């Protein structure tokens, strides 16, 4: 029988609740609203501050930026997104402008893994020129349309200009440029790709010596992470790390706590961490796993299986073979409730983030692994679609090639962290180059796209302004690189524009060269994403007419105390 409540009863209970929570102690602060040119000027100041800090890192003669940290030593870096994230301005309206450019760097980093400084350098002139033209009466919406029209044209030009990366030398060149000219890093990444393939798994870790090293470990990686952040156990970031762990596989969704309790008991009896990989988890079993992790301290983590349908089944079978586990599904009549010690796969190390899982040093039977590899090769010979071939090659790489680990050495934690930033940038840039090809570096590729903008036919004068804004922005990366090398950027750009299509400015040696032949190249994807993200956010920024912020919180005045005593002496 349902119990009905009348409104007086609900009101009284609500009042008691509010009284119990001391709602009067909560204070709701007013908002500050600013409009027009004044607030746009403040936002642009924030953009300038962030861009100034980021610009100095660009190019082979760019310098480092030091970030103070509340805990631990200061961080020294040339990584654009790291510098951008480290900026937090006191003025809230300036900070909004800075935050929007931070968003540009973050998006570029997520999509391409590199090019964050280029994105920041491009965002500033787009926002600045947009604001100036709006103050003269131009329509911000039409300006944005012109900007996006020009960007689409540039992207087409970059695609036509792009050349595929085929050789190990080209891979090394891309990695070297992205690592700020460090040839040792370029060679290290090229060697890693030669060992595990262009699409192989490569990770970066702290080394234990003064030198950088390459280690090849047999392992598997897939794009699914932990189901809940409550499983995180690492103090080096939001990730789960276990050694000598057991792995349990299930193709089906886990609905009941009774399905996971036997596995927990077995893992606990062996005093080993437990990794469960299943299609999905209902609330009850997930709660049991989280509570056992938090309250009892059992080392356990739940992960969703990768893919769907037949691909998920094959991926789990591959993992089970590589780790020596039993795959639970309907065909072999194995249930999670009936799992035994032999049901578990075993790995020497497991690293799990919110987006990926890496199983290292699997202890599977070599004969079973070879059978899986042979089976995949047979399927590869008969595959007809490119999609199926890509999936099969991906599975083959996981089973056959293993994982390349780049161990970065140095004299101190500060030095190692700075070098790791450059290695990660170089690795991401190299992957992007393999994916979409390369274009002349040093800002030359963007300069070669300017003539195509002259052929565009904008619908009105305000759209023409948007196109001209992009023309000016495309010159900025080359200008910045030359300026950081101590030369007049405008003069350098003028000379490069009069040269052949593959020529540009070598800032390291102060000479004009064929950029492709000299190995000064940029991944097409990095340049494309930098321009796309910068123009999208910066042009949206110019369309803002009002900004709303919280007003500064007023501190309560100190209590007034009566004087002690008070009598006459």
UniProtKB/Swiss-Prot annotation:
One of its GO terms (cellular component) is mitochondrion. One of its GO terms (molecular function) is ATP-dependent protein folding chaperone. Residues 1-29 form a transit peptide. It is found in: Mitochondrion. Pfam families: Cpn60_TCP1. GO terms for biological process: protein refolding. Testis. Gene3D superfamilies: GroEL (3.50.7.10), GroEL-like equatorial domain (1.10.560.10), TCP-1-like chaperonin intermediate domain (3.30.260.10). Keywords: ATP-binding, Chaperone, Mitochondrion, Nucleotide-binding, Transit peptide. Belongs to the chaperonin (HSP60) family. Forms a single seven-member ring complex, in tight association with the p60 protein. Implicated in mitochondrial protein import and macromolecular assembly. May facilitate the correct folding of imported proteins. May also prevent misfolding and promote the refolding and proper assembly of unfolded polypeptides generated under stress conditions in the mitochondrial matrix. Shows ATPase activity. This is 63 kDa chaperonin, mitochondrial. It comes from Heliothis virescens (Tobacco budworm moth). The lineage of its organism: Eukaryota, Metazoa, Ecdysozoa, Arthropoda, Hexapoda.
């Amino acid at each position: 029988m349902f119990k009905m409540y009348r409104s007086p009863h609900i009101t009284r209970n609500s009042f008691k609740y509010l009284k119990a929570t001391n709602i009067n102690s909560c204070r709701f602060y007013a908002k500050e609203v600013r409009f027009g040119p004044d607030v746009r000027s403040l936002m642009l100041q924030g953009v300038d501050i962030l861009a100034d800090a980021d610009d100095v890192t660009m190019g082979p003669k760019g310098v480092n930026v030091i970030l103070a940290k509340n805990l631990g030593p200061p961080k020294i870096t040339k990584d654009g997104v790291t510098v951008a994230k480290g900026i937090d301005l006191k003025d809230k309206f300036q900070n909004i402008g800075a935050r929007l450019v931070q968003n540009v760097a973050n998006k570029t980093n997520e999509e391409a893994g590199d090019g964050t400084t280029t994105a920041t350098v491009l965002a500033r002139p787009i926002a600045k020129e947009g604001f100036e033209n709006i103050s003269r009466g131009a329509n911000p919406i039409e300006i944005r349309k012109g900007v996006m029209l020009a960007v689409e044209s540039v992207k087409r030009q970059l695609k036509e200009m792009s050349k595929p990366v085929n050789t190990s030398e080209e891979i090394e060149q891309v990695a070297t440029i992205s690592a700020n000219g460090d040839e040792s890093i370029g060679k290290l990444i090229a060697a890693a790709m030669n060992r595990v393939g262009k699409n192989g798994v490569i990770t970066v870790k702290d080394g234990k010596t003064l030198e950088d090293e390459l280690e090849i470990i047999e392992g598997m990686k897939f794009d699914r992470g932990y189901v809940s952040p409550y499983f995180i156990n690492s103090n080096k970031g939001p990730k789960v790390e276990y050694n000598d762990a057991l792995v349990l596989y299930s193709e089906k969704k886990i609905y009941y706590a009774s399905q996971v309790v036997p596995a927990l008991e077995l893992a606990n009896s062996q005093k080993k961490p437990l990794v469960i990989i299943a299609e999905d988890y209902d609330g009850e079993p997930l709660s049991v796993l989280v509570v056992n992790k938090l309250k009892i301290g059992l080392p356990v983590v739940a992960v969703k299986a990768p893919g769907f349908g037949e691909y998920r089944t094959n991926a789990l079978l591959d993992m089970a073979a590589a780790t020596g586990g039993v795959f639970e599904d309907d065909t072999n009549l194995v249930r999670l409730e009936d799992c035994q010690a032999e049901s578990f796969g075993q790995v020497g190390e497991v690293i799990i983030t919110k987006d990926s899982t890496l199983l290292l040093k699997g202890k599977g039977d070599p004969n079973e692994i070879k059978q899986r590899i042979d089976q995949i090769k047979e399927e590869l010979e008969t595959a007809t679609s490119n999609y199926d071939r890509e999936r099969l090659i991906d599975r083959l790489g996981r089973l056959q090639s293993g994982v390349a680990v780049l161990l970065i050495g140095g004299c101190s934690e500060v030095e190692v962290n700075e070098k790791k930033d450059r290695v990660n940038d170089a690795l991401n840039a190299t992957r992007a180059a393999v994916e979409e090809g390369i274009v002349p570096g040093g800002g030359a590729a963007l300069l070669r796209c300017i003539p195509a903008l002259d052929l565009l036919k904008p619908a009105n004068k305000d759209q023409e302004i948007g196109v001209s804004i992009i023309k000016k922005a495309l010159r900025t990366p080359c200008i910045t690189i030359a300026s950081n090398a101590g030369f007049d950027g405008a003069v350098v750009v003028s000379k490069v524009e009069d040269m052949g299509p593959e020529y540009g400015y070598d800032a390291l040696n102060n000479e004009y060269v064929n950029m492709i032949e000299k190995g000064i190249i940029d991944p097409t994807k990095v340049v494309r994403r930098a321009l796309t993200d910068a123009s999208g956010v910066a042009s949206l920024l110019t369309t803002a007419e009002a900004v709303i912020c919280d007003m500064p919180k007023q501190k309560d005045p100190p209590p007034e105390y009566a004087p002690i005593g008070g009598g006459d002496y």
